[in-house]
Amino acid sequence: MTELARLKFYATQPHSCSYLPDEQATTLFLDPSQPMDVHVYADLSEMGFRRSGDHLYRPHCQNCNACVPARIPATQFLPSRQQKRIIKRNSDLTVHAAKPCFSEEYFDLYQRYIEQRHADGDMFPPSRDQFSTFLVRDLPFSRFYEFRLDGRLLAVAVTDLLPNGLSAVYTFYEPDEERRSLGRFAILWQIGETLRLGLDAVYLGYWIKNCKKMNYKTQYRPIELLVNQRWVILN
């Protein structure tokens, strides 16, 4: 951790919170001039940091601690009956790991997903520049996991492969395939891939109890939360 002590971090000015509309948020960023080293990234993920584009960040709010880092310990995960049904329902899909890049196929799917699922969010309206800045980064540890049915792209799970686990950066999927629960299936697949790679955990980002879009993460049990700088099992 001595290397981490030499890193520089910067805090943003307070701004409107993307998740809790009545709150002001402050974000702590790793110095953008710092090269994106996978081992530093892994250490920072243990401290609750996430990646967005070229930046590693975590919430740093003065008057709110609602954003709680969450991860799934893969070796302890026990799928529920509903989750087992989701896995079976999607057993006809093939998964392929691709290098992050821009394509019209990716963007068309991303655009439909944002327009139909997140039209009330700060990522609407989607644009090609936004997609590229957010997700298409030339990083050796980043993957686009493509989920296809007979060649048709149904979902993309943008995932970072770290020494300590997989970081689920973002998943977008076909909104018209609601029956498949593709967002949930992507997480279940990432848990399985973590086990296949002999890694420890899937890092899911932030659990926010009072935000419907973010509290789904407790459906995966057991789940660990970073509380007072310690990872603890949520009971």
UniProtKB/Swiss-Prot annotation:
One of its GO terms (biological process) is ubiquitin-dependent protein catabolic process via the N-end rule pathway. One of its GO terms (cellular component) is cytoplasm. Keywords: Acyltransferase, Cytoplasm, Transferase. Pfam families: ATE_C (PF04377), ATE_N (PF04376). It catalyses: N-terminal L-glutamyl-[protein] + L-leucyl-tRNA(Leu) = N-terminal L-leucyl-L-glutamyl-[protein] + tRNA(Leu) + H(+); N-terminal L-aspartyl-[protein] + L-leucyl-tRNA(Leu) = N-terminal L-leucyl-L-aspartyl-[protein] + tRNA(Leu) + H(+). InterPro entries: Acyl_CoA_acyltransferase, Asp_Glu_LeuTrfase, N-end_Aminoacyl_Trfase, N-end_Aminoacyl_Trfase_C, N-end_Aminoacyl_Trfase_N. Belongs to the R-transferase family. Bpt subfamily. Functions in the N-end rule pathway of protein degradation where it conjugates Leu from its aminoacyl-tRNA to the N-termini of proteins containing an N-terminal aspartate or glutamate. This is Aspartate/glutamate leucyltransferase. The lineage of its organism: Bacteria, Pseudomonadati, Pseudomonadota, Gammaproteobacteria, Pseudomonadales.
